[in-house]
Each structure stands twice: as C-alpha cells, then as structure tokens.
Amino acid sequence: MASEIHMLQPMCLIENTEAHLVINQEALRILSAINQPVVVVAIVGLYRTGKSYLMNKLAGKRTGFSLGSTVQSHTKGIWMWCVPHPKKAGQTLVLLDTEGLEDVEKGDNQNDCWIFALAVLLSSTFVYNSMGTINQQAMDQLHYVTELTDLIKSKSSPDQSGIDDSANFVGFFPTFVWALRDFSLELEVNGKLVTPDEYLEHSLTLKKGADKKTKSFNEPRLCIRKFFPKRKCFIFDRPALRKQLCKLETLGEEELCSEFVEQVAEFTSYIFSYSAVKTLSGGIIVNGPRLKSLVQTYVGAISSGSLPCMESAVLTLAQIENSAAVQKAITHYEEQMNQKIQMPTETLQELLDLHRLIEREAIEIFLKNSFKDVDQKFQTELGNLLISKRDAFIKKNSDVSSAHCSDLIEDIFGPLEEEVKQGTFSKPGGYFLFLQMRQELEKKYNQAPGKGLEAEAVLKKYFESKEDIVETLLKTDQSLTEAAKEIEVERIKAETAEAANRELAEKQEKFELMMQQKEESYQEHVRQLTEKMKEEQKKLIEEQDNIIALKLREQEKFLREGYENESKKLLREIENMKRRQSPGKCTIL
C-alpha cells in the first residue's frame, strides 16, 4: 500500500533567511516518504490577510499554520503541511502557506517574487488571498503575475517558431483561485447580481487604448487570463468583530459570522473536490519524491542565479527516476533468473527461453517506472545490461556444467586410471581391453542425468588429456601387428576429426541461437516501447487538446470584447501547438 503521512503540524519547507532561500532537509525527507499522488494547494497574498486561517481549515485543524494576528506577521518562506486527502483515498494533500508579500517589516522584499513564482510552480491549485474588492489597487498588488515571464522559463531553449516562451505556461500552471476576504459589497455588475466567478471575469475585462495608464491597467489582467485559463473566485465576509479577530483560531463556529462559516465550507469543499493531483507535462503524476525533486531543482536554479525552467526540472527528475527504473528492472531480472533457473540446463535454448520471459518482465518494469527517456538513452542502457547479465548466466551455467562433469568423470573414470597405473593393460591384448572398459564407462557417463551442455566438451577434453596413455598402450601391445596399429591410428584420427566437426556445428548452432535471441530481444524492446509511445502520444494529444480548448475560449472572449491583437496572438499560439502534435520517433539500441 502507498504510504500515508500524518504530520501533526506544519514544517518550514523553504526558509527565506537573509535574502536567501534555504530548503529544510527534514521537510524533504517527509516528501521522500510520500509515495501517493499529491494534491498541492499553495496560498499567496499580502501579509496579515488571513491566509493561514484558510489553510488550517483545509488541514481540518483550528491551529497549525501561524495566524500572525498581531501586528507582526509570522510565516517566513514557504511552510508545508502534508495530510491524508479528506475526500480522495490514496492521495495526499500538501498545503503550502507562504509568507506575506510586501511586509514592511522585512525591509527587503526581493524574495517576494521568488516566493510567488515557487508557489505557482509547485502547486496544482494556486490561491491568491486579498482583502476587499478586486479594484485597481488589488491588481497593482498582484504585480507579481506580470513578472512571471522574467522569473520562469517553460523551455530550456527558444521556440523555433518564434512563439513567446510564456505561451507554454498554460500547460504547467495551476488552477487560479482568488479568495476575497472581508468582502462587504453586493456582488453586482451594472446593477445585475452576479456570482463570484462572474465578478472575477468582469474584473479581468481589459480597457481599450495604448497609453501607459491603460497598459498598466491591462497588463496584470492580461497575464491572469493568458497564464491561468482555469479560474475560480470565492468571497468571504468578515469572520467576526474586530476585537475578536486576534483570537480567531480559538473561536467556535457558533461565535463566527454564519455567512463566513458557510463561505469557508464552500471554499474547502471546492478545494477537496476539484483540486487536481499535481501533474507534469505528458500527464506525469507527481508524488512526494517527485515534488521533492522539483523543490530542489527550482530553488537550486534560483540560488545559482538562473531562472527556474519547467522543462529542465522535468528532465532532471526523469534522469533520477529513469536511472532508478533501470536498476529496478535489472534487480528483478537477476532475482527471477536466480530463482527459476535450474543449473546446469541441458541446452542453451532452455536458458534463453527463460531469459526471454524474464527480459520481457524487466522491460515492462522499466517502461512503467520511466518517462521522458530522451533518445531512449536509459532503455539502451537497460538493453546492454540485460545482455551482460544474460551472458553472465550463460557463463555460470557452463561453469556449473563443467564442474559437475569433471567431478562425474573423476568418479567414473578414476578406477580405470588406477588399473592403468597398476599395469592391468600392459600385456598382449591389453589395448583393446582398455578400449572396451573405457567405452563402457563412457556409456555410463553419457547416461548420467543433469550434466548440462558442457558434457561432451568436458569428456573430449578429458580424453585428449589421456591421449599419451592410449598411444603408449597401442604401441606396446605385442599382440597387434604394425598394420593393425596403423589402422587403429587412422580410426582415432577419424574419430577426432568427427568430434571436431561436431564441435564446429555446435558453435555454429550457438551463434545462430544467440543471433536469433538478439533479434527477439530487439523486437521486444521495440514492441513495448512503441506501445508506451502510443499511449504517451495519446495522453499528450489529450493534454494539448485541453490546453487548446482553454486558449480558444480565451481567444474567442478577446474577439468578442474587441481586442483583435490579443485574439490573433492566441490564435498563433494555438496553430503552433497543433503543428507540434506529431508522434515521436522510436530509435533504440
């Protein structure tokens, strides 16, 4: 079963200290232990706007994330709380609470942009928390969204078609949820009652004009619409009287404003029901170890003065996991071969048949646990390792057979050697008596079971080592004429030549078997990889179709509002995405 994590309280994940971002290693160890898919909800907003209260509600606790209800704001950096998902079994809810933006007490707000960017990069649902209505001041305070193009890269190299890199953000970015706190106005637009979502969409309407003021008005709205096509809005009444706000976490629901309680329940219900599992491009599901890798890669890039690159982060993660997938597959191969093979096998084919079955399983394991294997680098490595392991088993099989046959020969032919030493055959007629006894022992050897595929080779080598004894017995047998001896010599030569031919034929047969196995192995790699690539291509097309649909919806909206330039830009992005929807090549081994 996948592991469940029960953190009793939040822990700092990324500390913002002295203008540096430092990862908490203990938090990484916790992420490493979460094998379940993670739903990552991050909240960002100005300092002392009640972000932590909402996050505690999502954790199902009154206390946990520090509320900072005094004049001094509490949360510094990014804090993490991992809890079992309350509605979706087998998933872990990872809550990320961030330090308040633009805190005057910090004096140095240079890391605010990075905190904002990291919250976007790591989350599957991004909650922006602000006070009051969505007016120009609220938009100005959300200037961080306009800076994302300067803080984040989606691709490691520029797009050849000239499309702006930020056009790819949609495929990586989370759902955007705007939480409006202490909202006291009626939800009206042009005298008509509207929903919070309709209010948000109205607030994101652009103004026409090319002057600096209009551009400043439009820029944050444009970025939200382009980068976050999936948007949601919630409004919250003031939770209690002002004098009670300082002890909000101690108040029971009956002491809070009933509308606020209902609004919080609606918010948490939405998050629990609709916040998606964090995924990467290609539908790669993020679990704890993968989230850990993303944290390390992104913070590492920021610390080194680079921009966090989403494509590079995925490829870094792929390098780690693909290497582990190779090892996992090889371990399975070795374990299964050791368990199932009975050495020595009687034929090479028997061993190769077993190898083929377990090799297929090993390839399945690798492909199941790997992704984004560029140019099939890791699958090629797996193929080479499987060949090496196979050859090691073939050698071991031969060694076991040779050792067993040598012991058997010593047992069977040992008494004959003793009789030779004692001179039993050093008499007239002794040569043929020796041959007769040796043939009987050879028959006994051949009938012995479980010798393996080296049986004939070991016997041949043994006979070759005794050729001088046979030659001596033949020469000294006084009962044989010279002519008879010549005939016997020729017979021995013919037997030797026949044995050599058999050995040559066996080598050729082994070569052909190995070539056949090599081709079968290649075809198995190609078959399984092709199936995986088809499945990945299907997922990628579905993913891109969803992105295209979101972009089309926004493009049509721009067109209806009369913003033809923005509509044309999105249309170019959509056409470029459609052109890129081509299947990958299968080039392995």
From Swiss-Prot:
Name of this protein: Guanylate-binding protein 2
Explain the induction of this protein.
By IFNG.
So what does this thing catalyse? GTP + H2O = GDP + phosphate + H(+)
Which PROSITE patterns does the UniProt record give?
A: G_GB1_RHD3 (PS51715)
Q: In which tissues is it expressed?
A: Widely expressed.
Q: What class of enzyme is it?
A: hydrolase
Membrane topology qualifier = Lipid-anchor
Q: Where is the lipid attached (S-geranylgeranyl cysteine)?
A: C586
Q: Name one GO cellular component term.
A: Golgi membrane
What is the originating organism of this protein? Rattus norvegicus
Instruction: Name the Gene3D superfamilies for this protein.
Output: Guanylate-binding protein, C-terminal domain (1.20.1000.10), P-loop containing nucleotide triphosphate hydrolases (3.40.50.300)
**Localization of this protein:** Cytoplasmic vesicle membrane; Golgi apparatus membrane; Cytoplasm; Cytoplasm, Perinuclear region
